[in-house]
């Protein structure tokens, strides 16, 4: 649930990169200022990136308990609190560049890297993209929790499995042992931009990671953890795919908030 923001765009809009908004409404007000400065307020790509933005707005507007309730029936997808979140989502979509809706996350993040757009909501792998582009945290970009989600960690995990009947189980087991070792976790995650599943790294070993990754490790250790919808941690794939379809329809102007909410409720029940 991280926002990646372009320092040049924020400064052009008269915003202080070190003082991000703390509520969705305040964030939208900042987007208004970015738009007035002639820049794109927020970017998003294809449906799964749109769902990632939506889920973080749901976390912000509903809170942890009500957000988790969306997955066990305690929170109604058709309820007023979800309607409010979808209204905020609609506003954000209206601030975005629709030409990017068929692109993956990298092209949608490029305007942030180029300083031509202000905000993008994306997972921690974005830091690897900024590093590859030679961009510096604090100088070229800043990162902060989606406003209203401070103290929450929106979770997903990379997983490697040993399939039943694999032709080379020995090699697969060697890979699993390697990737789960300290050295394997450090080598994999420092390049990908993610954080280790292991929690036994020393301070010296943590020092091999970027500033962002170290902050994410601290967040994961102390914050309330919720499951990501967009990345399959909260709902079955069938439901997630149906939500992606609903957001694609909404982005294309083929549905309104009322229809989107009905589609999401039906998807969650599928």
Roles of regions detected by a PLM:
Residues 199, 214-267:
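C-terminal capping/gating helix-and-loop segments adjacent to ligand/active sites or protein-protein/ligand interfaces
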């Amino acid at each position: 649930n991280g926002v990646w923001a372009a320092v040049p765009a924020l400064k052009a809009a008269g915003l202080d990169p070190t003082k991000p908004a703390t509520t969705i409404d305040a964030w939208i007000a900042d987007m208004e200022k970015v738009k007035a400065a002639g820049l794109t307020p927020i970017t998003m790509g294809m449906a799964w990136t749109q769902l990632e933005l939506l889920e973080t707005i749901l976390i912000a507007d509903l809170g942890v308990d009500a957000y988790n309730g969306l997955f066990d029936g305690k929170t109604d997808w058709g309820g007023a609190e979800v309607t409010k979140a979808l209204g905020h989502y609609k506003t954000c979509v209206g601030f975005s560049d629709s030409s990017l809706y068929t692109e993956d996350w990298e092209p949608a993040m490029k305007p942030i890297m180029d300083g031509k757009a202000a905000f993008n909501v994306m997972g921690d792998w974005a830091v690897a993209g900024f590093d590859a582009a030679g961009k510096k945290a604090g100088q070229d970009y800043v990162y902060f929790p989606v406003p209203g989600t401070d103290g929450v960690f929106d979770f997903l995990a990379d997983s490697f499995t040993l399939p039943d009947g694999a032709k080379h189980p020995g090699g697969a087991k060697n890979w699993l042992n390697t990737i789960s070792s300290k050295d394997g976790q450090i080598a994999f995650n420092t390049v990908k931009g993610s954080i280790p599943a292991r929690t036994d790294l020393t301070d010296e070993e943590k020092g091999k990671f970027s500033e962002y990754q170290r902050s994410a490790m601290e967040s994961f250790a102390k914050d309330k953890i919720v499951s990501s919808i967009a990345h399959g941690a909260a709902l079955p794939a069938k439901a997630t795919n149906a939500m992606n379809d609903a957001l694609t329809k909404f982005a294309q102007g083929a549905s309104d908030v009322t229809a989107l909410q009905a589609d999401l409720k039906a998807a969650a029940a599928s």
